Amino acid sequence: MAASIIPKEVSLDETGHIKLFNKFPFEGVEVKDISLVDYITIGNGQPLPHTAGRFQTKRFRKARCFIVERLTNSLMMNGRNNGKKLLATRIVKHAFEIIALLTDQNPLQVLVDAVAACGPREDSTRIGSAGTVRRQAVDVSPLRRVNQALALITIGAREAAFRNVKSISECLAEEIINAAKGSSNSYAIKKKDELERVAKSNR
């Protein structure tokens, strides 16, 4: 990308690439879970997680959507938060700043590790007609693993921040750090373990 067409507000790293929120580089971020490589998009040098719904026009296209934008969109899931993209983006930005301070790592890498760690690999589904219904354990597709991981992370952060002195940004940062470590203090990890335990009993 030619330097002349990049606005002066956008800062570049040493290699001339754009940084997320003008602070966090995309370079060196990798998905360690081989099954999720095609479903966690690190980003293609966009300073803000906003593509104006470009990835919702076709089914399954959201798999190519930048993972930070998907996290931002998940924060808007409750009815009263619908459409507040600017607020959600600000929450994610502050959460990333907190993660960078607490871990001394790139927050993008921490988020990718958290999503890979708290997506359930096995779930249970209902099988049978109205008369006899039983539950059967099934494998979870990689896209659904990412979807559920993002939903669980944001639900955990929202519940932790409710009636709490801590802000939603602090709770989101804490949730992402705990999920990346695989800690049982994370709401997402606890829910994932619960789903997998129920699925195991229904094999």
Curated annotation (Swiss-Prot):
Pfam families in the record: Ribosomal_S7
GO biological process: cytoplasmic translation; ribosomal small subunit assembly; translation
Keyword annotations from UniProtKB, A to Z: Cytoplasm, Ribonucleoprotein, Ribosomal protein
CDD domains reported for this sequence: uS7_Eukaryote
Assigned GO CC terms: cytosol; cytosolic small ribosomal subunit; ribosome
Disulfide bonds: none
Record's keyword annotation contains Ribosomal protein: yes
Compartments where located: Cytoplasm
Gene Ontology MF annotations: mRNA binding; rRNA binding; structural constituent of ribosome
Keyword presence, Ribosomal protein: yes
Domain of life: Eukaryota
Misc remark: There are 2 genes for uS7 in S.pombe.
Subunit structure and binding partners: Component of the small ribosomal subunit (SSU). Mature yeast ribosomes consist of a small (40S) and a large (60S) subunit. The 40S small subunit contains 1 molecule of ribosomal RNA (18S rRNA) and at least 33 different proteins. The large 60S subunit contains 3 rRNA molecules (25S, 5.8S and 5S rRNA) and at least 46 different proteins.
UniProt function note: Component of the ribosome, a large ribonucleoprotein complex responsible for the synthesis of proteins in the cell. The small ribosomal subunit (SSU) binds messenger RNAs (mRNAs) and translates the encoded message by selecting cognate aminoacyl-transfer RNA (tRNA) molecules. The large subunit (LSU) contains the ribosomal catalytic site termed the peptidyl transferase center (PTC), which catalyzes the formation of peptide bonds, thereby polymerizing the amino acids delivered by tRNAs into a polypeptide chain.
Similarity comment: Belongs to the universal ribosomal protein uS7 family.
Protein name per its UniProtKB record: Small ribosomal subunit protein uS7B
Organism per entry: Schizosaccharomyces pombe (strain 972 / ATCC 24843) (Fission yeast)
Originating gene: rps502
